[in-house]
Every structure is written in structure tokens, then in C-alpha cells.
Amino acid sequence: MKAYQREFIEFALNKQVLKFGEFTLKSGRISPYFFNAGLFNTGLDLAKLGRFYAAALMDCGVEFDLLFGPAYKGIPIATTTAVALAEHHERDVPYCFNRKEAKTHGEGGNLVGSPLQGRVMLVDDVITAGTAIRESMEIINAQGATLAGVMISLDRQERGRGEISAIQEVERDYHCKVIAIVTLNDVIRYLEDKPEMAEHLVAVRQYREQYGVTL
């Protein structure tokens, strides 16, 4: 695990974005951890979050021309990541996001920011069912752009109803790479170095045994 990944986990824990305990998910599964990126909700939080996304993007090796943030959670992520790439990596990358409702006056349309073109890196918080990705693909294709990859904060590495995860479905269906700042395996490695969190480590390992994808 790289230093920025460990720092991201600590950042998420400090902000209670990542919590351990017993949580009922929408799927009905009882999870020993919960991740809520909506709690990154201050200016300093967003500045730090952008730096983690930028570090992971520079680390992943996927070439891209533009950041796209799907409404609504992807909008601040795309914005802060673009700022971090410019300030910390000398990469001045254009960004774009969509409106849920098309505007009928002014500039009109449902896209805001730079023209949606070239190789697009879609940035979002997590992928649960892949619905937002599918909706975004319709927008990207309509503009004649191509999806270079998808960047998220956490990959739960968890099966859906079938044998693969929503992330693996996205990679299969759209022939792109999904990059995460951290994965569940990274969280487990972090817990392995924290003897005081041993009970959480046992619970997370058991959950992975039951619901984890085959990598």
C-alpha cells in the first residue's frame, strides 16, 4: 500500500466517512464497515480529497484529456481534482459536469464546463449498482467522446447478485479500467497494522469471505 492510500484511509476514519461496526446496506447485507463520502463536506475536506484523487490518477497510468463529474456527487469531486492536478502535478486538465435537468435559457443544454470531448476520465465517489456510469456513458457517447476510465474513492470488491461486482460489470461492459484510491484489501492491510482494531479486522475478513469477488 502506498503512502497516499494509507493517508486516505486515516483521513476517512478521522472524518467518520469510514466507520466500523454493524450496518445494514440497501442490499440487506449486514456490513462490518460503512463508507459515506458525503461527510467530506468542508472546504479543507474537499481540498484534501482532490489531492488524493489526483495522486491516484497520476499513479494509475491511464491517459485522459478531461475530467467528467456526474451530477450530483461527482461535481465537487471533478472540480477539486482538477484544481489538485493543476496545483500539485502541473497538469491543467479541463473538466465538465452534467445537470440533471436540461437548462432551457442562457447557454442551454445539460452540460457545464469544458466541451465534453477526447478521452474522458469519469470521477465519482463510489460505484454501487453502476447506474450513474450507464447514464454518464449515454452523455459521453452522445458527444462523440470516449471513456478512458472511471475513478472512485473506494472499491468494496463485493459481489452483486451474481458472481462479479458492479465495478467488474462496468469494466466488462465499457472496456475501461476502474481505478480506486483504495480497495477493501487496502483497508484490511491497514487494519492488520492496528492491533487495537483486531475485532474489526476479523469481521471485515469474514465479510470478504462471504461476499468478496474473485480477483
From Swiss-Prot:
The cofactor(s) it depends on are: Mg(2+)
PROSITE patterns from the entry?
A: PUR_PYR_PR_TRANSFER
Q: Which GO terms describe its cellular component?
A: cytoplasm
Q: Which family does it belong to?
A: Belongs to the purine/pyrimidine phosphoribosyltransferase family. PyrE subfamily.
Q: Which GO terms describe its molecular function?
A: magnesium ion binding; orotate phosphoribosyltransferase activity
Q: Which gene encodes it?
A: pyrE
Give the InterPro entries listed for this entry: OPRT (IPR023031), Or_phspho_trans_dom (IPR004467), PRibTrfase_dom (IPR000836), PRTase-like (IPR029057)
Alphabetical keyword list: Glycosyltransferase, Magnesium, Pyrimidine biosynthesis, Transferase
Recorded catalytic activity of this chain's protein:
orotidine 5'-phosphate + diphosphate = orotate + 5-phospho-alpha-D-ribose 1-diphosphate
Q: Which Gene3D superfamilies does UniProt cross-reference here?
A: 3.40.50.2020
Mind telling me what this protein is named?
Orotate phosphoribosyltransferase
Task: Name the enzyme group at the top EC level.
Answer: transferase
Q: What is its EC number?
A: 2.4.2.10
Keyword Plastid listed? The answer is: no
**UniProt superkingdom:** Bacteria
Q: Name one Pfam family in it.
A: Pribosyltran
- Which NCBIfam families does the UniProt record give? pyrE
GO terms (BP aspect)? 'de novo' pyrimidine nucleobase biosynthetic process; 'de novo' UMP biosynthetic process; pyrimidine nucleotide biosynthetic process; pyrimidine ribonucleoside biosynthetic process
Assembly and interaction partners:
Homodimer.
Q: Which residues bind orotate?
A: 34-35, 128, 156
